[in-house]
Regions:
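N-terminal intrinsically disordered/low-complexity leader segments
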Residues: 1-12, 168, 192-194
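Short linear capping/connector segments at secondary-structure termini
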Residues: 109-115
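Hydrophobic alpha-helical connector segments
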Residues: 62, 73-105
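Secondary-structure edge/capping motif, primarily at the C-terminal ends of alpha-helices
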Residues: 78, 82, 113, 165-169
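Hydrophobic/aromatic-rich alpha-helical bundle segments in the mid-to-C-terminal region
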Residues: 106-107, 118-130, 136-194
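Helix-turn-helix
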Residues: 16, 20, 24-58, 62
Length: 194
């Protein structure tokens, strides 16, 4: 049975607001974008926008929660798994896919780090990254420092692939796969040394 009526329209409007807001934030920056501009781009009244979101921060928080749900699920899954090389490879694979699914949000976050520090989601971003780093570490407190750096570097290789290699020629999926391959090599080397 398909959804129709007010419930579906509300869902579509909420999604449209998120999409347009993220587009404007990317074009103009978070600080320089107003709710009025978002409403104008959507061709809705400010009252219609306020029905869904009272502030720009509310929009960003909703985007963040929607797009990072797969990462929260990944962390919960990984916490229940043994700290094997296969688990760590799967963490990297799933994280890479989650980042690809929320690419526009992650680019926004990268480009607006100063603004995000002021928002309530800034701390949650750090907490997720630290949780992932801990899950990727070798599992031994006495692991050589170089191997611990490899584990952290594996995670940030995926970020670099998305954020800094987006302007190179080629298919974005090929770039993501190449970054995942390098990240997997790093975690494998760290695990084999441990």
């Amino acid at each position: 049975m398909s959804r129709s009526g007010p419930q579906q329209r509300r869902g579509n409007t909420r999604q449209r607001i998120q999409d347009v807001a993220l587009e404007l934030f990317a074009e103009q920056g978070y600080e320089k974008t107003s709710l009025r501009e978002i409403a104008e781009r959507l061709e809705v009244t400010k009252a219609a926008l306020y029905y869904h979101f009272k502030t720009k921060e509310d929009i960003i928080i909703s985007l963040f929660e929607d797009q990072t749900r797969p990462i929260d699920e990944l962390i919960a899954w990984a916490e229940e798994q043994p700290r094997t090389l296969d688990t760590k490879r799967e963490i990297l694979r799933r994280y890479s896919e989650a980042m690809a699914g929320g690419a526009s949000l992650y680019r926004f976050m990268q480009e607006n780090q100063a603004s995000l520090r002021e928002l309530s989601i800034g701390e949650r971003v750090k907490q997720r990254l630290f949780a992932l780093v801990e899950l990727l570490r070798t599992g031994r407190e006495d692991a050589p420092l170089a191997d611990q750096v490899r584990c952290v570097s594996a995670l940030f290789t995926l970020h670099a692939g998305m954020m800094f290699l987006q302007h190179i020629e080629g298919d974005p999926e090929e770039t993501r796969q190449a970054a995942l391959e390098v990240a997997t090599d790093l975690i494998t080397q760290a695990h084999e040394q441990a």
